[in-house]
Amino acid sequence: MKPVPVFGRAWTLICGGMAVATALACLPALASQETTSDTAFRDDPQAHALYDKMFDTMKKAKSLSYESRYHWESKGQTLGECAYTIWLKKPNYFRMEASSVSSGKGGILVGDDKTLYLYWPTGRPRFYPADDDETYRQTSSSVYMTKPAPPGGHSIGHEAGLLGAGMCMNIIDPSSFHGYTDSLQKHLDGVKSLGREEVDGESCDVIEASIMKGQRVWRLWVSRKDHLPRKLKETTHVSHDIITNEAWSKVILDADIPNDKFAWTPPAGWKQWRVPEPEERLLKPGETAPDFALLSAEGKTIRLSEFRDKIVWLYVWRAG
């Protein structure tokens, strides 16, 4: 079996006193020590003020809408590319429509002030390994997801990957508009200025934010007109850098957006669905576990079959 080098959510196998770490899922999370600078990031107060002003502008706006072209890649290979449009309105309304550039497939996320709905007009994506063939056949269409969305207590960014458009998370979480603060912000090292550039005819201040001692770096082209970004680039330093780019356009502040834009009712015959929890797919007593191979943090190959008749402890953690 060929080892699978993956990244993101980390799984630790502890067997006979030995700890082996590897990573799994969509978001990169493990900092690469080789890419961490020994020198502290020097914060520029003026650049930091521009960074804060950007978030303050989002939080103080009555409404905000924009379009974005989203692309992320690693090792020179595209991981996903999509276009999305988002509408945000106080106190707690939101709508995001995303579609894949290659297939046109995607989904819609709607918040009606209290509840979040996520649905797929042309059928939902397949979530591996949660979907076996029969489960997917029965639930691939006419289904939706829903959960409470309290003001400041929900994250559009964390739902974006479920839309099936080929994206992971928005670089800047749109829920910042509603007062949400993403967990990365408490790990902000500082912000520095990279001068000024024009983006589609707009004068922008270019700033760079370092997060988690440089594990994640945001480069932002912030418009001098409305203090909101027009280009965004995120570099996440793991074993292979993951680079995400966004280009914002049609940025509109404080327009009158009718509440109907944020209303949605499941059509007749549609059923509520959710991604099965991992524990729902546990092997039954007596079933043979499938063998698999992963790369350890040291680059060695670890196979489950090597620990036959031994206790295996899977420990899951996440950072970033």
Where are these regions (language model features)?
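N-terminal mature ectodomain segment of secretory-pathway/periplasmic proteins
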Residues: 35, 42-128, 211-218, 231
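Bacterial N-terminal signal peptides
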Residues: 14-26
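Boundary at the C-terminal end of the N-terminal hydrophobic targeting segment
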Residues: 25, 29-33
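N-terminal secretory signal peptides that target proteins for export/translocation
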Residues: 1-10
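Short active-site neighborhood of thiol/selenol oxidoreductases, capturing the structured segment around
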Residues: 302-320
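Gly/Pro-enriched, hydrophobic low-complexity segments
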Residues: 42-45, 69-71, 97, 102-103, ...
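An acidic-aromatic
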Residues: 87-170, 236-245
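N-terminal "domain-start" segment that seeds a small globular fold
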Residues: 275-304
